[in-house]
């Protein structure tokens, strides 16, 4: 009897402390830009799924991409980055956005993103949704830095625990005269955001692209 009680007690303890992982995917018109403070990898972009802990809060940045218009008037609509914060679930989750058929609908989506999080069985999951405001010449390359600032602000969909993670994975701007690169990071200097982002993308490019860019810059002096 004592042995049975011990076994039952251990089973109850394990059940109460166990965590379960669910898969998160998106509707076909959404792409992941960042996941829990980390940049979404290219391989994940193709698979469009990742695993979450059902006991933790999770945060993703997504963008809606949709062909709008018809015939010769077709064009690609890309939304502003949208932050979605939600609680993990043992069941698989789907983050969805409605289809956008024209630019007017796209503008409305940018102003008030309509994004839902549901389980595979159709149950709605509470989520906080907000637009990630961006500035600069190449805003798409600055998602992690902007997200770190957002999470530090305490805004509606912010998650404070991801602030440090995001900052560590974003580019680092340093004052002029102190531009020695840190290993594993892209370090830039400049008087304004545009200059910093030009330097960032230059360092991201391969040697051939850098050479072409320098030749182009010389020809446009």
Curated annotation (Swiss-Prot):
InterPro entries attached to this UniProt entry: UPF0319 (IPR018635)
Keyword Signal listed: yes
A Pfam family hit: DUF2057
Signal peptide location: 1-21
Keyword Signal in annotation: yes
Keywords in alphabetical order: Signal
Family: Belongs to the UPF0319 family.
Protein name: UPF0319 protein NTHI1987
Organism: Haemophilus influenzae (strain 86-028NP)
């Amino acid at each position: 009897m004592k042995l049975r009680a011990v076994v039952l007690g251990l089973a109850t303890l394990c059940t109460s402390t166990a965590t379960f992982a669910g898969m998160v995917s998106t509707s076909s018109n959404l792409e992941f830009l960042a996941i829990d403070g980390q940049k979404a990898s290219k391989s994940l972009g193709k698979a469009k799924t990742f695993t979450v802990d059902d006991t933790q809060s999770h945060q993703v940045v997504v963008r809606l991409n949709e062909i709008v218009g018809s015939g010769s008037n077709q064009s690609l609509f890309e939304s502003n980055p949208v932050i979605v914060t939600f609680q993990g679930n043992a069941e698989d989750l789907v983050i969805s956005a409605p289809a956008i058929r024209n630019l007017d609908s796209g503008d409305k989506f940018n102003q008030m993103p309509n994004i839902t999080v549901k389980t595979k069985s159709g149950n709605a999951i509470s989520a906080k949704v907000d637009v990630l405001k961006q500035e600069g010449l190449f805003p798409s390359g600055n998602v992690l830095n902007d997200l770190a600032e957002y999470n530090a602000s305490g805004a509606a969909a912010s998650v404070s625990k991801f602030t440090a993670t995001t900052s560590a994975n974003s580019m680092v701007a340093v004052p002029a005269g102190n531009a020695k690169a840190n290993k594993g990071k892209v370090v830039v200097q400049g008087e304004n955001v545009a200059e910093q982002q030009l330097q960032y993308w230059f360092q991201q490019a391969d040697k051939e692209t850098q050479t072409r860019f320098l030749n182009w810059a010389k020809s446009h002096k």
